Amino acid sequence: MPGEITYGRKRPLPACPNPLFLKWLTEWRDSAAEKNLKTQFVYQKAISSLKKYPLPLNSGKEAKILQNFGDSICKMLDDRLEKHYAECGPNIPIHTVPSSSSTLRKAQRQPKAPSPLSIPHALEPPEQESQDLSPSKKKKTGGKKQREYVPQRRSGGYAVLLTLYRDTKSPSSRGYMTKAELQKEAQPLCDKSFTLTDPNSKYTAWTSVSTLIQKELVIKTHSPARYSLTEKGLELAQRLEEAEDQGRADGFPRQVQASSNEEEEQEEAESETNPYIHADPVQCPDQQLNLAYSHNAKNTSSDPPSVQYNHVPEFTLHPGDFNILLCVDFIETTGGAAHRKQELVTELRRNGVNFDVRKLHIGDFLWIAQEKVQPVPGQLRIPQARELVLDYVVERKRMDDLCGSIIDGRFREQKFRLKRCGLRRPIYLVEDHGSAQHLSIPETTLQQAIVNTQVVDGFFIKRTKDVRESAAYLTIMTRYLQGIYSRKSLLSCTKEEEWKCDRSLRPDASSCILVEFKDFNEGAMKNKAQTVKEVFARQLMQISGVSGEKAAAILEKYSTPASLMSAYESCSSAEEKEKLLSSVKCGKLQRNLGPVLSKTISQLYCTKEPLS
């Protein structure tokens, strides 16, 4: 007899350690919303960012390290905090909401009984909380009828349903499958790995199983877990199998009409597995999406790039024909105190690590697969070994260096360049160096910067206490990567091809695609020659309020300054010039650029006399 059915439950969100700042931001957002001002969205983004961070803030200035906190909001918080101290006294705690507000809030919430359908939220007005369902829930359930959930073809949910269905038809079926069995059998039916995460994401194809359980298509019983189909899941899986068989007969894959896709599975998986990421039921949920994870959602389609693009490698390194080599940036061995710089190299040699010191244009450490070459009779020089770069790059930061890089802006720029370099496993190696209490930035702010890098940017963070421990970590990583890649055939690709190829590393695959090291290192050069479009983008981003997304939206319409100037010249009046860019759609939510920024840009490019 199967045991009791257990369904996945959402983890409780941690309480915000800065409720006073959250309260003030919420008041400002609501006030802006009443006046129909667009600043409400700015406050909403700041609220979302603040709620994701587990550390307390002592001033608005400290909040500047958070995403979506600019000079204006930080100054407003400091001014409001000063007023709060003047009203309540200098010793009043700021990490709790004042009792008067608390009592009022409690009185307003008194009629509401706890219900599993409603989730308390700091941003929900009291009158909305007194209802059983939130407005967003009503919109979903009211009006048109919901369509049946059908997983996308070759997604994690699709593969799991088909695998369980085929198991039920097997004469040796036990009526259930374990997690390991299910992952192994379902992998050939899925384009994503069931065990390894996608680039810049924390989720695997296995996370879709929680969606299947919630939709009552799969049941999970016992411990260790056993998975089997429900009647509803059996019926859906049978239809998927029939569509698959029909597609094979027709010579092309056929897809059952689906009302859902992998984005829905990803959103539900995020809310279950990440306690810091959740959808806001009051304001637009899309604002809550983390930029670090948005790449996968944008590229979701029924077929992955690897199916559409037939990659032909320039060369292939077969198992036994290459060595895994750690590359160390020469900056890590020169400059500063000689004994300190050489200590890392000494420790690596002591640990028996095969490494090479060279100029790296990005990161401090990375790993390559270097071809084994033999001397050719009659030639004086050994042929040059071909090299492929692995998907791991390490940026090493001592606490004092982290402090300096935050102050001069290098920290944000380095993270931006690491995201764009093409290597999908960026690692920040944070090394303690004495006491952080005497640095020019508070220790709590440095800790927030580290959390920010992991939670918002999606980088892996490794903390070490000294150089010796850092060398030990690099040694372990080198051994680990040697074990992974040494048994695989490595196919080369160029920098231009890397986004077209399926470069995911699957444990059961016999080969993987890697970028040539020479192309990668040249492409990562900081001061390489730039195109007119790149310089134009940098120029636009110097204007206050123009973010990378907004600059990219302008470049889609006007790729060069000449094309923008030509558009301005075709305008019949100064007012038309000022409004030329106001309707340009920006970002994931496709909001207008707005008349204020449009006017500022037009003044910059259309004013002939000196700007003052």
From Swiss-Prot:
Chain segments carrying region Helix-hairpin-helix (2HhH): 532-606
GO cellular component labels: nucleus
InterPro entries: DNA_pol_lamdba_lyase_dom_sf, EME1/EME2_C, ERCC4_domain, Mus81, Restrct_endonuc-II-like, WH-like_DNA-bd_sf, WH_MUS81, XPF_nuclease_Mus81
A Gene Ontology BP annotation from the UniProt entry: DNA recombination
Span of domain ERCC4: 325-434
Amino acid composition bias (Acidic residues), ranges on this chain: 261-271
Single GO MF annotation: metal ion binding
Region called Disordered, residue ranges: 89-152, 240-281
SUPFAM superfamilies the UniProt entry points to: DNA polymerase beta, N-terminal domain-like (SSF47802), Restriction endonuclease-like (SSF52980)
Region (Winged helix domain (WHD)): 150-261
Reported cofactor(s): Mg(2+)
Binding site for Mg(2+) 1: 329, 332, 364, 395
Domain of life: Eukaryota
PANTHER family: CLASS II CROSSOVER JUNCTION ENDONUCLEASE MUS81 (PTHR13451), CROSSOVER JUNCTION ENDONUCLEASE MUS81 (PTHR13451:SF0)
Protein's UniProt name: Structure-specific endonuclease subunit MUS81
Organism, as annotated: Xenopus tropicalis (Western clawed frog)
Lineage: Eukaryota, Metazoa, Chordata, Craniata, Vertebrata
